[in-house]
Amino acid sequence: LLGTAAATVLLLAASSAARADDAAKVLKSMTDYLGSQKTLSASFDSDIEIITPELQKIQFASSGQMKLSRPDKLRVRRTGGYADVELVYDGKTISIYGNNAKSYVQADAPGTVDQMIDAVQAKVGVGMPGTDLLLSNAYDELTAYAIDGRHIGQGVIDGVECEHLAFRTSDTDWQIWIETGAKPVPRKYVITSKTLAGAPQYTLRIKDWKTDAFADADTFVFKPPAGATKADLDSGAIAEFDELPPGTPSGAAK
């Protein structure tokens, strides 16, 4: 009996290790595939949760589109109840336009999309959840602080069969659903903050993936709409570009 129990424990341990290795392998196939594409475009729906001081959970929803041309061009449009924002990067200048505010900010940012994303999040303070999936070193970034990874099984997102992976870090849990087959693109991405009361989540659903070249030469050219005003990057106007409404409690969001 003891021998059987020991064998069972060893089998479970081996199975757990195999599942962890499998999770890393599936994730790597996704990041390698995305990273190898010269151009990418997709549509997305996102939900971000906040926890109020009264411990009520509120969710804000938005939708958008993304177009990427490696290594140095990106265009993202996101529309929600409190923000209608467009980010355009041409390899030299980053432009962020807020349609509700009818104003835009610009900054010199020569380099790659990877460098631009780092600069925006670090210097401007505009959150860009999900952009880590687009980085050229996405696998390293996603797994940098992971303490556990598991291949949970299969799932279906928007009618598409996916592999379901779950990873943990010290302060967040995150899950990703990756399409099976020859094009392993991410279909759903969920980040759960464990250090905040109520464990708020950020959820991203991605669809309409395309890898076609963009025929329009103006895709990554920012043209301020008539009547738009230019705001200073360091001014309070940048708050107009947030995904959350004014007055959201500090620290309440994921």
Where are these regions (language model features)?
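Acidic/charged, solvent-exposed loop-and-adjacent secondary-structure segments enriched in E/D, K/R, S/T
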Residues: I96-D132
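N-terminal mature ectodomain segment of secretory-pathway/periplasmic proteins
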Residues: D22-S103
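Gram-negative outer-membrane assembly/targeting C-terminal domains
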Residues: A226-K254
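Gly/Pro-enriched, hydrophobic low-complexity segments
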Residues: D21-V26, A42-D47, S95-I96, V105, ...
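Sec/Tat signal peptide C-region and signal peptidase I cleavage site
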Residues: S15-A20
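Edge strands and adjacent loops of beta-rich recognition modules
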Residues: S136-L142
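Short, surface-exposed linear segments at secondary-structure transitions and domain or protein termini
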Residues: R70-P71, V113-A122, V185-R187, K210-A217
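Bacterial N-terminal signal peptides
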Residues: G3-A13
